[in-house]
């Protein structure tokens, strides 16, 4: 099931310039999700990171993983209209390859565990088949107040 950017914005609250998932390529609710982020030189982070050699910040790769996982949570629950997804922990984040404008980040997230409102994930970002980043993280799903 492919989910385009318009539908992604129905499932998570992020917007430009902080929406870091362009398309969902595959989703298996309650299990895993795969999506992409096309990295372009027009993104605001590249004005300072770094002007002479733009490099995608590692924290934004982790954020892209978390946003993709939030889409998986929303699809698994059927809706998150009355809920919010908050990142609780980031563990073992590793950055193995530079990501730069022109690259397509292929992001994959897997649910490792889900208990009540706490969800644990493993995620990777690959570019041209090489692992660029990997991380484990935990998110909490809370009712909106």
UniProtKB/Swiss-Prot annotation:
CDD domains: FabZ. Its main location: cytoplasm. Its EC number is 4.2.1.59. It comes from the Bacteria. The active site is at 49. It catalyses: a (3R)-hydroxyacyl-[ACP] = a (2E)-enoyl-[ACP] + H2O. Gene3D superfamilies: Hotdog Thioesterase. GO terms for molecular function: (3R)-hydroxyacyl-[acyl-carrier-protein] dehydratase activity. It is found in: Cytoplasm. One of its GO terms (cellular component) is cytoplasm. It is an enzyme of class 4 (lyase). Keywords: Cytoplasm, Lipid A biosynthesis, Lipid biosynthesis, Lipid metabolism, Lyase. Pfam families: FabA. The keyword Ligase does not apply. GO terms for biological process: fatty acid biosynthetic process; lipid A biosynthetic process. InterPro entries: FabA_FabZ, FabZ, HotDog_dom_sf. Belongs to the thioester dehydratase family. FabZ subfamily. Involved in unsaturated fatty acids biosynthesis. Catalyzes the dehydration of short chain beta-hydroxyacyl-ACPs and long chain saturated and unsaturated beta-hydroxyacyl-ACPs. This is 3-hydroxyacyl-[acyl-carrier-protein] dehydratase FabZ. It comes from Rickettsia rickettsii (strain Sheila Smith).
């Amino acid at each position: 099931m492919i989910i385009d950017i318009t539908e992604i914005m129905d499932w998570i609250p992020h917007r430009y310039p902080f929406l870091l998932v362009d398309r969902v390529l595959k989703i298996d609710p309650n299990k895993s999700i795969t999506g992409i982020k096309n990295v372009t030189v027009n993104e605001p982070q590249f004005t300072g990171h770094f002007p002479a050699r733009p490099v995608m910040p590692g924290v934004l790769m982790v954020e892209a993983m978390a946003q993709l996982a939030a889409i998986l949570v929303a699809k698994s629950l059927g809706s998150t209209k009355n809920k919010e997804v908050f990142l609780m922990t980031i563990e073992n984040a590793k950055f193995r390859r530079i990501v730069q404008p022109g690259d397509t980040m292929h992001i994959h997230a897997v649910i490792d565990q889900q208990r009540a409102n706490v969800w644990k994930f493993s995620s990777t970002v690959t570019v041209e088949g090489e692992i660029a980043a990997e991380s484990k993280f935990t998110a909490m799903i809370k009712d909106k107040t």
